[in-house]
Structure formats: structure tokens, C-alpha cells
UniProtKB/Swiss-Prot annotation:
Residues 1-20 form the signal peptide. Gene3D superfamilies: 3.50.30.30, Zinc/RING finger domain, C3HC4 (zinc finger) (3.30.40.10). The lineage of its organism: Eukaryota, Viridiplantae, Streptophyta, Embryophyta, Tracheophyta. Residues 21-165 are lumenal. This is Receptor homology region, transmembrane domain- and RING domain-containing protein 4. It holds the Pfam family zf-RING_2. SUPFAM superfamilies: PA domain, RING/U-box. A zinc finger (RING-type) spans 234-276. One of its GO terms (cellular component) is protein storage vacuole membrane.
Amino acid sequence: MIRSSIVILSLLLISHLVSAKVLLIGNSTSLSFDDVEATFTPMIKRSDQGGVLYVAEPLDACSDLVNTVNVKNGTTVSPPYVLIIRGGCSFEDKIRNAQKAGYKAAIVYDYEDFGFLVSMAGNPSGVLIYGTFVSKATGEVLKEYAGRTDFEVWLMPSFETSAWSIMAISFISLLAMSAVLATCFFVRRHRVRRRRILALNGNDFHRMPKSMIIRMPTTIFNGICDEATTSILCCICLENYEKGDKLRILPCHHKFHVACVDLWLGQRKSFCPVCKRDARSISTDKPPSEHTPFLSRTPSMTPTSSFLLSSSSTTPLQSSHELPISIRVDPSLPSTSMQPHTVPMYLSHSRSHTSFQNGSNRFSRPIPVSRSSADLRNAVSQRSYNSPHQVSLPRFLHSRYTHILGPGNASRSQVVGLLTSQREHSLHQNDSRRSFIHFASASSLPGW
């Protein structure tokens, strides 16, 4: 719709720009006719003089004209205009023959009344006279006054046309600017909308530049596999690593062939093919393995009481505020003294235990006590504790309670009571007493 409107306005603009007026002025007579200027002749810019009109011989002016400039009483009637009929040859031939005969302007009229005027076209090279096209009716009227020296023909430029042309040009310019602005607006809106959709879908991963990829660390595979999931084969090409292969390490600590991962990051997406982590991020975290804790040290975690089931050798504590706890099963006790779903437990120090620390945020899950005593008795190696010295106590407990109990005189109930009171004090400081409800008193340890 917009394109068709622009084309129509352009045609109207062209037709108005080349249009002019033919005036026939004589004794008390003035006639005006519409005409269209030729496109290959000089444009009529002013009307400072007129000329006498003559009829061409031959009328179609397809050959050299017989009648040239008329000479009367030794004076030259100047400038003469010639009237030519359409047809027989091209407009360019008619205009050139009229120019050769010495005429200043050529007026071509139509041989049929089509109702509209046409614009004459041709090669403008060497054409110096004016040329206009009029209708059949205008040509017949002008033919009646041809050869009369008391009547002159004037070719007038249309000043009204200039105003129309200015308005048309302004309107077309405004329309074009509006179309360009609307196109830019809709294109920008589409791009913003597409970016939002990609961001919501989580697909806002772009390709990484080669400079960032080269800065990532690399390593040489020596045949030793670590705990990482990508330490055996490349998850991109699915080929096992061979000794001497060059591997690239991503920020998530996953490893791949250098050629494979460089092609992936440079031409596909900027995330890890395994864990989908953005490779553009920087991380100093160690890769997860069997030696790293299950729970990371984050401020969002709440303190939780924890103790681990372990059978490793005991080592001294690092701080006087730590109270390690481990759970052991005494297989030497008779099975008749055990209640269903209860397990007799001892307290000993283990190197792999997590200590209770004031203000610490790193804890493990509590171990449930409701387990079968038979299963635990079969899983744990048999050990017997015949004296209170075999109860693995921390150094600060030995130094604190030796002068009270005395070596060799402490009973199990006394040791458990002292340890229970100390444990309750530590649990109160760590705000996790609820998790140790089964160990709040010595009565919860059967068989002691």
C-alpha cells in the first residue's frame, strides 16, 4: 500500500514538473492551452518573448522541412515556432528537423484525442530548441492561427506546478522518513523481545572469543586418573585419554581435549558440556572428590549437630574446645541386656570426627540410633573395654577428671556422667541440643 502510494505521487510529481502553458495572444484575443514539455529538450524557465507560429511542411516533419524562417521586406520574423503532427517517426527526429530549419520551438499535437498528454522522450545530445506536446483539439485551434503575424505564441512555465511539486516532495520525504523510523522501531523491539526470551529460557550463552579460550589452563595427561568425572575420557569426542595428550581445564575443573573443547567453546556455546556451567566465570573451588566435604561452607546453612561413625585410630585434639564423639558397639555384652532397636555406645576420639566448634557452620548429618544391634555387632570388629582407661578421652578430660576419679577407681557410670554433663554443656553452646535427645543422659546408654 505504501509503495503504490509513493509510485503514484512520483508520477504526478513528474507530470506536474514538465507541464507548462501555451498562450496564443493577438488582437483582443488570449487563449491558454495545456501542454507537456519534452524530456530531452531544454526546460522552459521563463517567457520573455513569443514567436509566430507556422505549420511544418511536411506536416509530420519526418524529413527536412521545406519552409524555413520567413523573410518579409528584408526583415526576419523572429523567433518562429513550428506546429507538427504526431506520428510517422520519433519525437526526436521531429525536433531535430525543426531545429535544422531554424525554428526556436516545436509544438507537436496529437493525431487522435486520447484524453491525456504524453511526455516526449529522446536523446538530448545537441538539442537546443524547446519542445512541447499538446492535444489534438489544441493543435487544430493553433493551426487556424498559424502564419498570422498579428498573433504570437508564448510558452509559459507553470508557477502553480512549482507549488504542487514542493508540496509533493515534502509529503514524499515525510512519508519516507516515517517508514524508516517505523522499521527501525519494530526491528529494535523484535531484538529486545528475543533477548528477553533467551534470557528467560537460560540460553543466553554466546560463543567465547579465542583470546579467552587460550587463557584457560592446560595440562598433560600422565596416565594417572583423579576423582573428576572427565579424567578418563573426553566427553566431547568420547575417546580415552592417552599418555601425553594435552587437556584443557575449565573453571568447573572438567577436562577435555584441547582441540575438542576449543571448537565447542568457540563455535557452539560458552558452557561446560558436562555440568553446563558458564566457562567465562572464574572459580577457585576445588573439584568435588571423596576427600572434599559433602556440604560446602556457605552462610546460608544452619548449624546442625553431627557426629560420624568411625573405627580409625585416635589422635589428640587440636583445640581444647573440641569434643569428638564416635559410636561403638560392644559385642562382649550379652544380647539379653540389649533392648530392641538400641545399641550400647562408647565415646572415643577419632581423627576423622567433626569437632564441635563455637560459631562453626560446617556439620554433618546425625546418625540414627534405631538400628538393629545384630547388624552393628556383625559389622564392627570385636573390642572389649575392661577399665576406664580404655575409654578414649581427650587430653583435657584426662587432666580435668583424673584428680577426681583417680586412676583405676572410675566406674563406667561416673565416666559417662561426666562426659554427659560436658556434652550437654557443649550442645547448649552450639544450640543443637535437640539433635542429641537420645544422648542427654546416662540412662540412654544401655548396658552401662
